[in-house]
């Protein structure tokens, strides 16, 4: 199977980084449990763009720690012969640091793609399954005929309850939920 896997809030807990940058730069706390929609409305669009850009600098990328079980699960899938496409809504300038991070954490992959056209890229390269936290990407992938899965977050809880999305609280649960799909 051809699997695409997002990075931020999928392979690692991104929200803490975004919150720290928001507090430092703008004095605005971004409570994780209160983020029940995809849009971050506590920041102005220009502030959010600046905060996200800062979290995608080399220093922040390399400081990220993967979720427990994420690397081991992806490694097992890769060793079982599944194609692993790592995809992130990051500017092209973040590619080298992202590649360095993936190497540092020991996550094997076949392709890394940093861009803002995630679902169309998945369609272009024949991805079967997208693992992502964004309800926008999950809906787009469903509409494109892909299977979808996610790590459960406050902002994607609704899509987990209303759409055909495999949802799990953590990577151990996600691996178990996807086992029959990947068999």
Model-derived features: where do they sit?
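Conserved phosphate-coordination/catalytic loops
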Residues: 61-68, 116, 168, 172
């Amino acid at each position: 199977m051809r699997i695409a896997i997002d990075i931020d809030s999928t392979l690692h807990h991104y929200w803490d980084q975004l919150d720290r940058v928001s507090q430092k730069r703008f004095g605005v706390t971004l409570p994780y449990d209160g983020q029940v929609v995809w849009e971050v409305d506590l920041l102005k669009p220009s502030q959010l763009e600046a905060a996200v850009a800062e979290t995608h600098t080399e220093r922040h990328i390399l400081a990220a720690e993967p979720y427990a079980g994420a690397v081991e699960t992806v490694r097992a899938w890769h060793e079982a012969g599944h194609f692993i496409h790592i995809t992130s809504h990051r500017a092209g300038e973040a590619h080298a640091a992202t590649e360095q991070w993936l190497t540092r954490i020991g996550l094997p992959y076949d392709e890394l793609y940093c861009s803002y056209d995630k679902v169309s890229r998945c369609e272009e390269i024949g991805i079967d399954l997208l693992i992502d936290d964004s309800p926008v990407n999950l809906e787009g992938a469903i509409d494109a005929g892909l299977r979808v899965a996610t790590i459960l977050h406050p902002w994607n809880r609704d899509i987990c309850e209303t759409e055909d999305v495999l949802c799990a609280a953590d990577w151990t649960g996600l691996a178990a939920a996807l086992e029959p799909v990947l068999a």
